[in-house]
Amino acid sequence: MIYKNSDFLKVIKMSTVTLKPDGLYIDDKRFDMLSGDIHYFRIYPGGLRRRLEYAKAFGLNTIQTYCPWNLHEPKKGEFNFSGMLDLKGFLELADEMGFKVLLRPSPYICSEWDFGGLPAWLQHEEMVVRSSDERYFTHARDYTKRICKEFVPYLATNGGPIIAVAVENEYGGYGYDKKYMNDLADVLRECGVDVPLYTTDGYFCDMFERGCIDGGWVGVNYRNESSIAINALRKFQPDKPAFVGEFWSGRAVHWCENFKRRDINEVAAGFKEGLEEGAYMNFYMFAGGTNFGFMNGANFGVTFNAPEGTPTRYIPMLTAYNCDPLLNEEGLPTPKYFACRKALYEFLGKDEPPMPEIDYKSQEVAPISLKKRVSLWDAADYGAAVKSKLPLNMDEMHQDYGYCLYKSVLTGDGKEKVLDLPELRDRADIYLDRKFVATVMRERDHQPIALNLEKGKEYVLELLVENMGRINFGEKIVEKKGLVTPPTLDGEVIENWECLSLPMTEISSLEYKDAADQTGPIFARGQFTAEPNSDTFLDMRDFGKGIAFVNGFNLGRYWSLGPQYTLYVPGELIKESNTVEVFEQYAIPADGKLKTSNCSIYNEE
């Protein structure tokens, strides 16, 4: 086979890939696979090579990655495989650097990613996702066929680096629809996937059985209990090599909880124990990356180390996918990297080789003056709003991400009224005549929102509602966003709304002006000079809540409640002259300055 690499044309020998009880064989030679997750879609273009260099220096020979359906097909039938979504480029770079690839292209990925990687437009129709429901499976089949065109030429059997392909993700912890799983596998095979197909699940109850496909390779996911998990896997599947699909080297972190790292020595010991058990080990994650834009997911549960009895609720993930991995968000080795590398070479009975020199630069930029500003109230074009007797949710407006602004007019009767937002998804700032009243977060206890409305006087009620990320795992994964049911005033439904979609995709085209007003909700813009190809971090500790852009690229959400206080700006995004834009929901700092840092800042335990 011949395919075009970014640097050269390359002719490659086709291989065979087979599974035996003692290992995975490539061309009848046992392959001692050691792998880790690095997700191309979480890393700004140009940043992959450094992370792969550190992976090679560690001792990895294989990279595992998901493929996010929601980014590759943002609208039905419209596909994107460019920029950060250049799957072919990732596969060619991995091959150039000597890595094999475990590819996980199936429709659902979880991965603390919005809607688990499913496209939001699926929720515009009635269907049962992750099932053999034909209304869902038709879309899943179409996507699978399309993405196969991207990666099938890169299978090992076609001379490429891909040695195995995953079917779905941790399905044993979600459903039990064998037809769905086997039909997905059949689509892959029909598209020419002739390397081993695999699934990965936890080892509790009957997860292996519920999540596997007929004749497939089963892997196990777990935190640290290597011997227990691997022995459970071998008991279920004695005829194939033991494969740890996800050795959880860290943990996902939500907003409003402290960033607590896992014990380094425990992780290194668990990793070494898995090697001693003779299993193929895969770090999840090896390099974390970033949930740029609005791509962070959410859970429905409790935060880490929550007191017993804490009620379950919606908890969104951070922008940074800095889930305490071996390489941090900016792609640099952590103490855990070196501890696990030491454990690897102790297992191999070899001296650790010296670390190679790998170029990296970061910078702190002079405080950025945000002189140009425009209030949301001036920018909001209610002429584009949809008028409706009852408020429309985001899905009814065919809006997938961002904010919505809802407006209605209330007439006072001289009595105090209580405003309630019964099904809010996910967070709302409440304004009366454009004066801030309160913030409401879904499933959180809050004081009744009392409104004192003078008799006969009209008031404009406006609700700025934010979709903070779709749930990525569990039974509550399907849900509408925005105002799902109408707000009430003393139990009576409020009617006659103007519903304005604010996807936050065009903020660079706003009419910014020199202004002193710092009160939110407000857009602000500034210019800064910096050294290209040198990382920096926006220090958002003086701000409240919102999103930030550099050179038109959405870096993601910030929130003063932490534990993440900085937004990562990849050096590859930075030019000599740069523009930063911020949407701040509450207030710009009094001095109008945005600071930066040369490293990330967290509230850590």
Predicted region positions:
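Aromatic-lined substrate-binding rim segments of carbohydrate-active enzymes
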Residues: 48-114, 185-190
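N-terminal carbohydrate-binding accessory modules
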Residues: 4, 8-62, 92
